[in-house]
Amino acid sequence: FVRSLAGHVERLGVKVLTQAEVKGFTKENGRITATHTTRGDIAAGEVVLTAGSWSAALGELAGVPLPIQPAKGYSVTLRRPSGWPEMPFMLSESRVAVTPMGDTLRIGGTLELAGMDHSINHRRVSAILNAVPRYLPSFEIGSHEILETWCGLRPCTPDGLPFLGRVPDVRNLVVAAGHAMIGVSLGPVTGMLVRQIIAGERAENDIDLDLDLLAVDRFAA
């Protein structure tokens, strides 16, 4: 999905730089004048910090505190059993999502606060799989080929709301991060709002959303 988006914007003339770790920023007169990466320095009139669970570390490099905590979630991808429901569904009490994807089945869930740790906790994985037979007794654990066991980090904030807006002390820096478990769902409207903020098109009464609730400095002492 992300690769498809990158390919689309490249066709529109956007330069996408991969494998480029940000190492720091140069600031002058309250603005970022250069972003230093492992593939060279980048100068831009506007900078958008939208790096998911890594946003806090980049914010620190820019002198912008962002209280974002990574919350690990897991998924297990199996060969899709015959006769399985066509639609994705949620096992609400167990907080497990079951998603058919072509000839595969993805079962995901849980929330683990373990910092930037990408290791697989197999007890968490077992708990996800063990939840399924309680709802679908025909599902037999161990009788289906596991194609992939995966974990990812969700960027969570103290109040559950993302950060979205300009940084008061760094005038050309916009933050869009901390969307927790619904980053894909909120991605389109977030992109629209970031564009409006940068272009100066957003009026205070534009759509029924108070961006002050998402202010980057709302937890500042």
Name these PLM-found stretches.
Residues 27, 167-221:
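C-terminal lid/capping helical subdomain adjacent to the catalytic/cofactor pocket in oxidative enzymes
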Residues 1-6, 12, 110-113, 171, ...:
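Helix-loop-beta segment of a Rossmann-like dinucleotide-binding subdomain
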Residues 1-7, 53-54, 124-131, 183, ...:
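Mid-domain beta-loop-alpha active-site segment that forms a flexible
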Residues 61-69, 78-172:
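Active-site lid/adjacent beta-loop-alpha segment flanking the redox-cofactor pocket in flavoenzymes
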Residues 27, 33-85, 121:
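Central helical "cap/lid" subdomain
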Residues 34-36, 106, 174-175:
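General beta-strand recognition
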Residues 8-12, 61, 193-201:
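Active-site catalytic microenvironments for nucleophilic, acid-base chemistry
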Residues 1-45:
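Helical element adjacent to the flavin cofactor pocket in flavoenzyme catalytic cores
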